[in-house]
């Protein structure tokens, strides 16, 4: 059984998003039905809507930073009750059997992660639709509890931007005594600054925009380096233990690899659509590394949400009605948002 839900969808890679009606499954024994209140706008929404990664399925309902209230629960649900704040991130199921799923690393499921949108359910036929919609039904195992201590609109982007930066910082045990460079001050970058600073690291913002210095320091950065200033970049050669690279546009890795100290690690969490050349000698000469990281598993995402609630950390957001989503996409591409658009889903219900 299914029921209809209002949404906004992209009909194709070249058309504007507009009103759409989708079908959600009725609540099963282990399901939670969430009345969506806010949904963040991730840069990857744009990549996928425009088929920049070459795997898009249409019509597409984007959105994987979903925050709302539980409206219904299945008769076997144990962790949620009606009225609870709940979140849904970048995936809604996994195989539940592979070593990574067993270890709480569902994002690296080896047998087929079920992404929140632009994918298919386990039957291989039913498309998944995201949070640019009024409701969603998800198994409680893949649903996150959200503290009422968090501002609900600022909590939504934590489901992607928050965990995408939290997970690698925790994996590499970043903390006091470490020097961390954050490349790019956008949705991911501003969370990387906040989190790295909260862990006790000395944080430097690396940006090509001098106008971002004041904001970077307000967010918690201790230093700011203008990447177009060659002299300033030379002064930080062999300096950082870690760089968190959040940039989704093509950029020159060698410029930043040379700022890493011996055994320094460049953590890539942005997803440029085109391959990037890697200069071998920038790695060889100081035993530097380039690594990647993809969001986080359910246990770690819950840990991140709890940590943010305890430490008063949330995303800086601009709330928009869904009718402005196409204009918002253009503003994201221009860097004209501080620092995450969040859709007020009430605008879709009217």
Give residue spans per PLM region.
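C-terminal hydrophobic helical "lid"/dimerization subdomain
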Residues: 2-3, 7, 254, 298-350
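Glycine-rich beta-strand-centered segment in the early N-terminal region that forms part
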Residues: 25-39, 52-102, 107, 129, ...
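Adenosine-nucleotide cofactor-binding segment
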Residues: 176-185, 195-255
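N-terminal Rossmann-fold NAD(P) dinucleotide-binding loop
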Residues: 189-190
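Helix-to-beta-strand junctions that scaffold the AdoMet/dcAdoMet cofactor pocket
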Residues: 260-261
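Glycine-centered, small-residue-biased loops immediately flanking beta-strands
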Residues: 264-265
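Rossmann-fold NAD(P)-binding glycine/threonine-rich loop
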Residues: 270-286, 298-306
């Amino acid at each position: 059984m299914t029921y209809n839900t209002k949404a906004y969808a992209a009909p194709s890679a070249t058309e504007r998003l507009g009103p759409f009606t989708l079908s959600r499954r009725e609540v099963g024994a282990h399901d939670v039905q969430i009345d969506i209140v806010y949904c963040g706008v991730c840069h990857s929404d744009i990549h996928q809507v425009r088929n920049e990664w070459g795997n898009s399925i249409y019509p597409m309902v984007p959105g994987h930073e979903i925050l709302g209230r539980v409206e219904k629960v299945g008769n076997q649900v144990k962790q949620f009750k009606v009225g609870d704040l709940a979140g849904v991130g970048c995936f809604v199921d996994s195989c539940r059997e592979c070593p990574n799923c067993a270890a709480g690393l569902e994002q690296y499921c080896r047998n087929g992660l079920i992404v929140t949108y632009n994918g298919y359910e386990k039957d291989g036929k039913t498309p998944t639709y995201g949070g640019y919609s009024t409701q969603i039904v998800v198994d409680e195992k893949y649903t996150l509890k959200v503290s009422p201590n968090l501002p609900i609109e600022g909590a939504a982007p934590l489901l992607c931007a928050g965990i995408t930066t939290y997970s690698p910082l925790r994996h590499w045990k970043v903390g006091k005594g470490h020097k961390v460079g954050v490349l790019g001050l956008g949705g991911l970058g501003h969370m990387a600054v906040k989190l790295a600073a909260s862990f006790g690291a000395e944080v430097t913002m690396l940006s090509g925009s001098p106008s971002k210095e004041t904001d970077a320091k307000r967010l918690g950065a201790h230093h700011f380096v203008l990447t177009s200033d060659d002299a300033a970049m030379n002064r930080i050669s062999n300096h950082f233990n870690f760089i968190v690279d959040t940039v989704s546009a093509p950029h020159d890795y060698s410029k930043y690899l040379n700022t890493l100290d011996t055994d320094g690690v460049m953590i890539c969490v942005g997803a440029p659509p085109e391959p990037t050349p890697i200069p071998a000698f920038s790695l060889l000469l100081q035993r530097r590394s380039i690594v990647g990281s993809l969001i986080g598993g359910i246990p770690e995402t819950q840990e991140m949400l709890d940590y943010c609630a305890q430490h008063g950390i949330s995303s800086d957001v601009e709330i928009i009605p869904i009718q402005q989503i196409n204009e918002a996409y253009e503003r994201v591409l221009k860097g004209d948002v501080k620092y995450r658009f969040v859709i007020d889903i009430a605008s879709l219900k009217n």
